[in-house]
């Protein structure tokens, strides 16, 4: 653990031993108006992150995603925005960047297609071995789009040799270290 913290201090210059609020994650399943309820859930977690917010929904056939800078109440307060996020399943995220740059591409949830189907992922906390895992994945040919350690989780899920999405998630969890919360949404969870 000390080794990973030392690496974070040296390479990323982001380590802050003082208590800071961090991201908030929310998930809801099999309800009408999942996007609106997720926006309300994120609003109740607003104190945990105010840089950006995002929601990924699933309607049984496809995924929908919306990510924006700023507060939940300013971004998910219009019916049109919420109506575009169709589905009865949703995950959401409030961003407070502890790792990665404050850019739109780092706002979660992230979505990826894997050989087992699509998956949406949101996480809060810090992965103490994210630099090691990221370097290992890059050496193995992975291409990263963001500077967020959450993408490391997505890459581990996608790269897993397991056949079922839930097994891919478990495989990824066994590789990451640190304190975190994780929510996912996937079609294969519904079967």
Which residues make up each language-model segment?
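Conserved short alpha-helical segments that host acidic/polar catalytic motifs at enzyme active sites
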Residues: 1-191
């Amino acid at each position: 653990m000390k080794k990973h913290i030392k690496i974070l201090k040296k390479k990323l210059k982001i380590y802050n031993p003082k208590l800071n609020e961090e991201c908030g994650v929310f998930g809801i399943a099999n309800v009408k108006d999942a996007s609106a309820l997720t926006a309300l859930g994120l609003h109740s977690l607003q104190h945990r992150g105010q840089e950006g917010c995002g929601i990924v929904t699933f309607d049984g056939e496809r995924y929908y995603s919306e990510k924006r800078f700023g507060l939940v109440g300013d971004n998910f307060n219009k019916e049109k925005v919420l109506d575009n996020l169709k589905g009865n399943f949703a995950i959401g995220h409030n961003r407070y960047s502890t790792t990665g740059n404050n850019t739109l591409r780092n706002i979660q949830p992230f979505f990826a297609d894997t050989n087992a189907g699509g998956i949406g992922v949101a996480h809060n906390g810090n992965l103490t071995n994210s630099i090691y895992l990221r370097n290992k994945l890059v050496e193995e040919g992975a291409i990263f789009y963001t500077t967020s350690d959450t993408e490391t989780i997505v890459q581990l899920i996608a790269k897993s040799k397991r056949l079922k999405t839930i097994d891919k998630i478990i495989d990824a969890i066994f590789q990451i270290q640190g304190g975190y919360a994780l929510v996912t949404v996937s079609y294969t969870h519904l079967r």
